[in-house]
Amino acid sequence: MKVLVPVKRVVDYNVKVRVKGDGSGVELANVKMSMNPFDEIAVEEALRLKEGGKATEVVVVSIGPAQASETIRTGLAMGADRGILVKAEGTVEPLAVAKILKKVAEEEQPGLIILGKQAIDDDSNQTGQMLAALLGWSQATFASKLEVEGSDFKVTREVDGGLQTVKLKGPAIVTTDLRLNEPRYASLPNIMKAKKKPIAEKTVADYGVDVTARLEVLKTTEPAGRKAGVKVKDVAELVSKLKNEAGVL
């Protein structure tokens, strides 16, 4: 079974995000970029399937600028076999991403597509679901456990108030939650090996997908600053402030 893993290049989660002066978006110049953390979990799970004899090949695909090849190399250094870079400039909205991934899936014919439940830059949580609808495949979102049973998949999902287990007919699409696994760190030898692994380069035009933006960002702003807290001497003072100042009692 071949596993296809879409990954996204995003601002590193350790970086403090800065909004552009004109409010048109987030400042990306000279900012450290890395693989979306949820996608790292997807790559790790695909590699575990291969190591467990359930998968034969892991292919990483990314849609974005030429620099997205660095994100693919991260996946290759973790252990993926090869990569596909679909070059696209500017913001590519989830529906367009799903349409491109549909074309890639039709070419690659994977038995499983596993991707992060959302990207930490836009938090859309849409691509996996849209891709499943376009392909007509089974899907399970927010996976915290994934098991392969022949050509089927058993997925435990994180839902409000507990867990839900579903069984999918392959081929299928699974989106990952944080508790699915802990991604490995790429070793130095594997980082060096990744430089020699193949990355096929495509363009959006190769797949005939219209990536024209259908959404307009009106304004981007930073979260409002929080009012500083105060220390109280005792319970009586706390109750007084909650009653007279906060008005919650």
UniProtKB/Swiss-Prot annotation:
InterPro entries on file: ET-Flavoprotein_bsu_CS, ETF_a/b_N, ETF_b, ETF_beta_N, Rossmann-like_a/b/a_fold
Coiled coil: none
Highest rank taxon of the organism: Bacteria
Cofactor: FAD; AMP
UniProt cross-references to CDD domains, sorted A to Z: ETF_beta
Cofactor binding notes: Binds 1 FAD per dimer. Binds 1 AMP per subunit.
Gene Ontology molecular function, alphabetical: electron transfer activity
Keywords from the UniProt entry: Electron transport, FAD, Flavoprotein, Transport
Protein family per UniProt: Belongs to the ETF beta-subunit/FixA family.
Described function: The electron transfer flavoprotein serves as a specific electron acceptor for other dehydrogenases. It transfers the electrons to the main respiratory chain via ETF-ubiquinone oxidoreductase (ETF dehydrogenase).
Complexes and interactors: Heterodimer of an alpha and a beta subunit.
Identification of the protein by name: Electron transfer flavoprotein subunit beta
